[in-house]
């Protein structure tokens, strides 16, 4: 079995973040990174905006910092787990973001890395700690080539371990390290200086850090700017010119500011209020800090954040009464109320601050209301301080959530609970959905019988002015839009036809013409540009007697009519008059659909015609001898009748022909008007219902020029990087459900449309008004007959696959409604606006989800543990339909959150062969509480819940599972099969003891005959439940695995994950299955067969054959995240195959797709191999080009210059290599950033097997067209660029 792996939602625990001007000298960007990928955000305005795509790293990122060049541009310094140190800069081409390597050095990866390596950069050097014994310096010279010199290695002092490292940015080549002498147990503060002349790292001074109290230890250091600039005397003698850097050291109870020369030692205690409020077992730690130089260099702002969430401001100023010696104060600044432990603070020069938190849901963007006063009281905490206010809050999937709940598979929807505040009884629910949310602005019921709508906006109008409603009773209703109101409009007589005919088409033509096409006639009405209600009849046209108009299509100057006698009528607008061309071609079959290229500036050269013989013909509209040729230039045969057509211009003489078919399939063909060639680029079966309408909506998500703060001269600076938004065309497809086809980041997608009440839309048209922006707004008719005005503001794409809808639900006893917290529909890009006064401190809880369907109500039971030491948890019930809380009975009361007097470990739900639902809740004390539950119909509560009994087990229980009419309870190395008794759970049967099993942590069942158990040490075992009610262990794994999750894929196949970040598939072979079947699962016969076939091996190695059979390893893959759960979905969003979803502890959502056809496997394998070898291909090819260039220069000197060779070199280097080359040659790691060995990474703990890495395949999509062409030519000559892109997008569009 071959699987294709894709990460749909990347890890969200951002362990690294750095700020800098990465894309321009005066820009404000922030880089955030997990262990596996890098993201870039623009902070120019008050809302952060994501720039380009993610940079995926196929290794673990250990350290990240920035180094600034002489032009004020920031470069990234990265250190990977593979031992590679890389300096790179960002390059933005359109919407494609790349990291271009400038320097690469490989350290000895065999060095013991007991302590996490650290990287800090100064202006002209980079300092790295690698292993326990080494410090490495990389000299940097921005004015010379090569800029980065060979690293210089230095040994640490004996028995010394580097705990913290920082760069003194105001002093070139100066560093400070906080080190621990492991022998003497002494903390040391070392000032280091890299001497360029001596090429040596010098220890300029060292201090032992001591405290009078045992529990007051140094744990943090940070940079302080050059205090001499701010009038502080940093030396004893004014005459000395030697620089004296300062550094801040954080202890558990105070901070200490020391200088390099040892002259000053300034100590500031933390406020007593904080120290007294700390729990006995908690120490105060400084977890983050940042420094911002104020405008005009008038001062600096240095903020510290503690693990309690408090922000402190450090003030250092000269003592004018004592020779300007420094005075330091530690002042309370403010508190970030819902983030107590951030990993980084970032202060930007536009007066804002970003807090990055690794172990929390939220990353907060704040605004400075004030930077405080130096004369404030610094001894106490002032809870009324309001120096900062929250601008927005960005919510991620909880990095340590134990599970997600799969709500539905059409559209693909997950539910994730955010932190809850137990005092306010509120919860935050994140609905993560792979769909295009249609944001609803207005919804209004319409008269019964509306079958179609048309919106009208002429060239003279800025907004749409009329909506035409087509009724099934052969009438037409006109609605007028004015001043953001819609009302019925009755025009003057002898203009529009409103009765006794069915309107099939209404549109504008030319500057001021409106055409209305009915079954029995069409009319052209002229509109006065000065008076929107002054209509004038210009033309009436009637078909021949006994003939009706079946369909019509028009653009700015052309109108095509399809008649019931199979004739096509062509009319062209000239001088506000529609002129009919005499020739009317007659087709052999009934015309079902028409399409013209709708371009306001050009005439369409082609006409697409669908006919009842399952054909689509593309006819030429070229005028020959004053007649339309109607020559068939392209045709396509279909499997069913084409029901709707649409043509959209793609530029460069290319058009896309969209085809909706009666059998529910949807196709997109690319037509080249230069040679009239046609190629299919997308095909998807969307259901069984006919695709009745294809509607085009222009969506403009492009961000206009972003404004920066004024510079020092008062002039505002504009961000020139305008290419960060998106402008595209959305084709809305109406069938069984509503879908949308669109292009995003140069790739084509098709995703379902989502409406909150799951309404199906019949048709959709463009719409705009004075209060609704036209970019992405639309007017739709729902199947229930209501008019819906809404808009698009999020389109899923490879780099942002899910939208997020944050919903706040009130769980207090006096509230029963769900309150929406606003649509954060942009997934991970846009932020959610928040009211600071409503922010509460959120905790991280362990949750279990359980789907419960009873009496037509689909709900989710949510069990939540507190993170404190109290033995309690809570249960709440969420209605899947509207994400609202449901009431539960609790001691005769109706509550939304039921308290349970224990912590929950696992849950199970079953009827156990009765009519009554039983809920089994396993506590952490190995007690199972059995509840009887049912959905109430008496209106008092939504769910009635009654405790039946509780059963305690002696040995620790980690999981439970319902099997047949029994509850499986693992006890040490065997399984107990229990049934519900009157006073406790009763043992119905006991499974056999499994000798090699130590601790059963997970369970899964297949149908009524097989059980899989996962052991924390000894992998997976497969058990068989025989017809004689015996349980036999029939197979196990040959490897030891620390299993965290398992799931049956079929009767013989199990997928699982372990704590080392690997996913694997185990299977019982077909041959072994045949043996089991022949033995009828009889234990005696199986033993005889085992002795007969494998007796010799059993005698030699009895521990190997401790079961009848062994599970074969079918697939193995490293995902770099611990899997907490799997879901197997047969049909997801009209996919053509089942999908395996997995959820990771760091917030990952991924999938494994089975590849069913050999051609799929070979294509995707070739793409994977091309990208795996891309770095090698790039480097070797360009080394060859370097040699050619050298030969060329030598030949030029000898006047033997070959123009042909020059042409090849110029083409190869000038178009591709020229932007990436350096004077020292081409840098390795062009495509994988950290130059990782992909196979080694995906085989981190075990060799990868039968899994194609879709993540590395999709990095091809983020390359520029030049790089794509170059790589395809040299690494995969059998493929072409278009084929590769279509193959990758087919996976996204058809498989998921």
Swiss-Prot record:
<keyword id="KW-0507">mRNA processing</keyword>
<keyword id="KW-0539">Nucleus</keyword>
<dbReference type="InterPro" id="IPR050358">
    <property type="entry name" value="RSE1/DDB1/CFT1/CPSF1"/>
</dbReference>
<dbReference type="InterPro" id="IPR015943">
    <property type="entry name" value="WD40/YVTN_repeat-like_dom_sf"/>
</dbReference>
<comment type="function">
    <text>Involved in pre-mRNA splicing and cell cycle control.</text>
</comment>
<keyword id="KW-0747">Spliceosome</keyword>
<dbReference type="GO" id="GO:0006397">
    <property type="term" value="P:mRNA processing"/>
</dbReference>
<comment type="subunit">
    <text>Associated with the spliceosome.</text>
</comment>
<comment type="similarity">
    <text>Belongs to the RSE1 family.</text>
</comment>
<dbReference type="Pfam" id="PF03178">
    <property type="entry name" value="CPSF_A"/>
</dbReference>
<dbReference type="InterPro" id="IPR004871">
    <property type="entry name" value="Cleavage/polyA-sp_fac_asu_C"/>
</dbReference>
<protein>
    <recommendedName>
        <fullName>Pre-mRNA-splicing factor RSE1</fullName>
    </recommendedName>
</protein>
<dbReference type="InterPro" id="IPR036322">
    <property type="entry name" value="WD40_repeat_dom_sf"/>
</dbReference>
<keyword id="KW-0508">mRNA splicing</keyword>
<dbReference type="GO" id="GO:0008380">
    <property type="term" value="P:RNA splicing"/>
</dbReference>
<dbReference type="GO" id="GO:0005681">
    <property type="term" value="C:spliceosomal complex"/>
</dbReference>
<dbReference type="GO" id="GO:0003676">
    <property type="term" value="F:nucleic acid binding"/>
</dbReference>
<dbReference type="Pfam" id="PF23726">
    <property type="entry name" value="Beta-prop_RSE1_2nd"/>
</dbReference>
